[in-house]
Amino acid sequence: MTRRWFRARLALAAALALTVTPAARAAQPPLIPRDVLLGNPSKTQPRISPDGTRIAYLAPSDKGVLNVWVRTIGANDDKMVTADNHRGIRQFLWAESGKHLIYLQDVGGNENFHAYRVDLGDGSVKDLTPFEGVRAQNILTDPGHPGEMLVGLNRRDKKIFDMYRINLDTGEAKLDTENPGDVSSWDTDADFVIRACTAANPEDGSQILRVRDAAEQPWRDLVTWPAEENGDLEGFAPDGQSLYVETSVGADVARLVRVDAATGKELETIASDPRCDAGDALFNRTTHRLEAVTFNYTRREWKVLDPSLKADFDALGKAHPGDVDVLSRDHDGGKWTVAYSVDDGPVQFAVYNRSGRALTPLFVNQPALEKVQLAKMAAVVITSRDGLKMVSYLTTPAGMEARSLPLVLLVHGGPWGRDVWGYNSQVQWLANRGYAVLQVNFRASTGFGKKFLHAGDRQWGGTMQNDLTDAVQWAIQRGVADPRHIAIMGGSYGGYATLAGLAFTPQLYACGVDIVGPSNLKTLLEATPPYWATMRKMLYLRMGDVDKDSLFNRKVSPYFHADQVRAPLLVGQGANDPRVNIRESTGMVEAMRARGLPVEYVVYKDEGHGFARPENRLDFYGRAEGFLAKYLGGRAEPFAAVEGATADLR
């Protein structure tokens, strides 16, 4: 893309935009085309080969479909090694031998992922898990066993995943460890033997850390985390006699600790932060030593545990602005791929060489973003009406005063997830169109301790929704938001919150955009995939037992309150969504239309829980852009149905 062509395109987009005031037009930067912000990245997710000589990364083919490419470090010999022509590839890893790449792919968004092996010698591709209706997950590899991988498959029983050991040269798969019926994840020791797992108690929702001393030895329960605690397994220590776990027992936040593999006794606290839970742990792939861990309250921070790496993280922190993430490392740990995320620019990827502490840029995720002005994201802490501190992020349009702006409350999914600081294509798209964007880590968001998490138990449509209302009022009271022009928007749980916001606080919002959001909690849980079975008790504890308590379900499900909606609604849905069945969206739309309420509905026949294909993504967001401009008054790039999209207007 040339600079001249890009500027001409921006000028055309700005000239054709919906009418805005002369003052606003003069102050705001030109419209950034939707396909720059919301289309496929130019290049992303570089992963270094085990020997440190090559990187594999994702980039579009000449047909615009994301595929895996390989490049020799220091050369320009980039070669596409996969040949997907439809949904694109998003998950891949190197085999430890360096001879193969492994990638995951489903069909039409059904999330029954198959694991494929690409032979980098002859280019052949083999489906390693060629079983109809079976999902591959929990892939494990180990440098000491370069010709193998372990993978979980629900082949024997659709509700649970047994672990299979696959020979990557022949494709032969053998059952390694059978699931007794309650295990949700597995892990190996330094000898690549499955010796630990986490299981769910279906009676009380507790989580169990289970271990065994060898492959032929019986399993035994080591640690039990009650449902009100947070706990997770990170991995074995190198000697196999202790394990690293994250646990909130004895504290509010989850600490990273080491426990005895024989007794479960806590041996030492490795790292903790009083503000937030421990995050990603960084292990040496060859020695299995724990070397660093992240914490993220408002921004990502690294706590270095291996003194020999302190100078490396110091060098990375000084080399480039933004928050740094370590994406991959070679076997000897000498070369890394890293990513720098800033709030107002593209993601920068680089290779870091510990020898000389040299950082060599690779590419950015979208070069066109280097030529435009993006908006800044500010971390703010908002206090709810009952005193909870909610880490939130406010982004206001570049070139405009942050006063009386139309605002989009962008609600994250999960709800057991969180928003983070850094580049966000959806946020930048909205800000470029003239909207302030508010992202709130409401109660039940993860990473802020067990009290904050469990304050959201049974509070869908209750205090969780109040948190969002309080955040909007915060923005209004500070003069940032125009109270007449507030929208609520989100996907998955964020879609539910959109429906709940319009139904339960109809006076607050001018419009809403719901993407794959559930409208009836009972029917949502009735239609979940069979492999969610081990999570069912946890879902009841956190959401409420909507199967037994029909009055509670009617209270919190927007479907039963469709008559209260007053603001226009746009709904986007994937026809094959395995998590939120299409009936959730169709039911809400029909309930609103039966009452003569304004709703637009678009279904994409080859999508699941979200819009993976760029044609569908650009089609939906083009419709959403016009919808928001109509009801909030922001700018919009002209829209016509996108060629190749499978939109079905209903």
Which residues make up each language-model segment?
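N-terminal secretory signal peptides that target proteins for export/translocation
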Residues: 1-6
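Bacterial N-terminal signal peptides
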Residues: 9-21
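Sec/Tat signal peptide C-region and signal peptidase I cleavage site
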Residues: 22-26
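Beta-strand-rich domains and repeat architectures in extracellular enzymes and scaffolds
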Residues: 35-66, 335-337
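Peripheral, non-catalytic segments that deliver or gate enzyme domains
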Residues: 40-41, 63-68, 84-90, 96-391, ...
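Beta-propeller domains
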Residues: 57-83
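Cap/lid segment of the alpha/beta-hydrolase catalytic domain
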Residues: 365-492, 497, 526-536
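Active-site-proximal cap/loop segments of hydrolase catalytic domains
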Residues: 442-650
